[in-house]
Each structure stands twice: as structure tokens, then as C-alpha cells.
Design a protein with these regions (language model features):
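Condensing-enzyme catalytic core mediating Claisen C-C bond formation in acyl metabolism
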Residues: 80-191
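Conserved catalytic cysteine-centered active-site region
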Residues: 1-47
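Short, surface-exposed linear patches
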Residues: 11-15, 45, 72-76, 122-126, ...
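Structural motif
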Residues: 49, 191-192
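Short, flexible, mixed-charge acidic loops at enzyme active sites
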Residues: 3-10, 66-70, 130-135
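Conserved residues at the C-terminal ends of beta-strands
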Residues: 25, 53, 193
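N-terminal processing/targeting junctions
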Residues: 2, 41, 64-66, 129, ...
Length: 193
């Protein structure tokens, strides 16, 4: 959706200057990607400081009434409760929140934290889509964007509801997290033994 959250925040700062902005999208890692971008900008000398902010307001998208039309349209809910669980799971896992941090090439007079490195990677080349919004998985395994669907199907199929592939998360979530941590520790010569 447009404009980006970052652009809207910058638009509210009427006394500020034109600045570089970035709006990573996603749920789980977007704030970490923003922090990495700010860190690399300051580290490289491109900027002297950067403000990293993260803000999530997903609760309006997780209310049960968002799924009512789909539940009415799907007669198999009783025989296949996984359909409901796939979406209801997220109602318990995601929450609203916001925060920000100022990164600078100089320590502050008070308490300062130092970032030595940030490692963020994607496994999208190896794994199927794990979390989605605005997509529909077809019977053949293809993904269809809401832009290619009829508007009448958007609500009956809860296209804009956030969906989590619980099976994929259960199978690979811990494995890929541990692999990434191990690779990062090796790269940065951290030994916890």
C-alpha cells in the first residue's frame, strides 16, 4: 500500500530536511532489516546518524470478523480445522508495537550501545512462502497475487488476512534459525564453548 510508512513519518516532520528513507516490508524481520540499513549507512560514512523505527499495527487484520465471509464460504471447516488454525495462530503470535533508535558515529554523553555487526539473511530461495498477505496458493502450488484476482474473491477467500504456513514453520523455523546463528558466529569468530 502507498505511501510507505517511512514516507508518512517523514511527512509529519515539517522542520526536517530532505533525507534518504527506506521502508522494508514484512512482519517478522522488517525492523531488523531497517536497523541493518541504518547501521551500514552510518558505518560506511554515508550518513553521520540515522533513526531506525519499527511500527506494527496488525491487530485490526487479525480480528475474527475479517474471516467471516471465508468461513461462511468454506463448508469444510468442521472436517478440516487447520484452515481456521492457520489464521488464528497469528492472532496469538503477533501484537502491535512501535519503537525507534538513534544510531550515530559518535557515542552519546550518557549510556551508549555499540553495534559490532548485524547479519540478516533470507531463505526464500530454499523454502516456500511461510507467511503471506494478499496471496492465494492455488491447487497446483502456484501463488496468485490479489492484483490478479476478482475483487469479489478478496473477501470470500480472506485474501488480505495474514496467513502463516504452520507446517513449514514447524519443520524449518528452528533449523534455519540455528543454522543462521551458527554461520554468523563462525563468520564473526564468536565461540561460546
Amino acid at each position: 500500500m502507498m505511501p510507505s510508512h517511512t514516507s508518512m513519518v517523514h511527512g509529519l516532520l515539517k522542520d526536517s530536511n530532505p533525507i534518504p528513507i527506506l521502508s522494508p516490508s514484512g512482519v517478522c524481520c522488517s525492523a531488523a532489516h531497517a536497523l541493518e540499513y541504518c547501521f551500514l549507512s552510518v558505518l560506511s560514512g554515508h550518513t553521520n546518524n540515522a533513526i531506525c523505527g519499527g511500527s506494527e499495527l496488525f491487530s485490526p487484520l487479525l480480528r475474527s470478523n475479517i474471516f467471516e465471509e471465508e468461513y461462511k464460504a468454506i463448508s469444510q471447516i468442521q472436517s478440516n480445522p487447520y484452515i481456521a488454525f492457520e489464521k488464528d495462530f497469528l492472532r496469538w503470535m503477533l501484537s502491535d508495537g512501535a519503537g525507534c533508535a538513534l544510531l550515530s558515529d559518535m557515542p552519546s554523553d550518557g549510556i551508549s550501545l555499540k553495534i559490532k555487526w548485524i547479519e540478516a539473511v533470507s531463505y526464500a530461495n530454499e523454502l516456500d512462502v511461510c507467511m503471506s498477505q494478499g496471496l492465494q496458493n492455488t491447487a497446483s502450488g502456484e501463488w496468485t497475487s490479489w492484483k490478479a484476482m476478482r475483487p469479489v474473491d478478496w473477501q470470500t477467500q480472506s485474501i488480505f488476512a495474514i496467513k502463516q504456513n504452520i507446517k513449514l514453520l514447524a519443520e524449518y523455523g528452528v533449523e534455519k534459525s540455528v543454522l543462521h546463528i551458527a554461520n554468523s558466529c563462525k563468520k564473526h569468530q564468536l565461540n561460546f564453548a
